[in-house]
């Protein structure tokens, strides 16, 4: 549920940014249709890249901690 709310908030920010960047031009279409798909996809790609940069090292560290924990437990049982 929170993911959908965050997604809508991000889209509304993109729409407001694109609306504020078009000054002095009469817009005959709605603001949401003026945002191009390529702009949204490039923003999503940048967001995914940032998330992967953060999550991949975290997953590696957590995996290493779990591996050490598992190894120590196996040594204690032996």
UniProtKB/Swiss-Prot annotation:
It is found in: Membrane. Residues 20-51 are extracellular. Keywords: Glycoprotein, Membrane, Sialic acid, Signal, Transmembrane, Transmembrane helix. The N-terminal extracellular domain is heavily glycosylated on serine and threonine residues. Residues 1-19 form the signal peptide. The chain crosses the membrane at residues 52-72. It comes from the Eukaryota. Residues 73-78 are cytoplasmic. One of its GO terms (cellular component) is plasma membrane. InterPro entries: Glycophorin. It is a single-pass type I membrane protein. Belongs to the glycophorin-A family. This protein is a minor sialoglycoprotein in erythrocyte membranes. This is Glycophorin-E. It comes from Pan troglodytes.
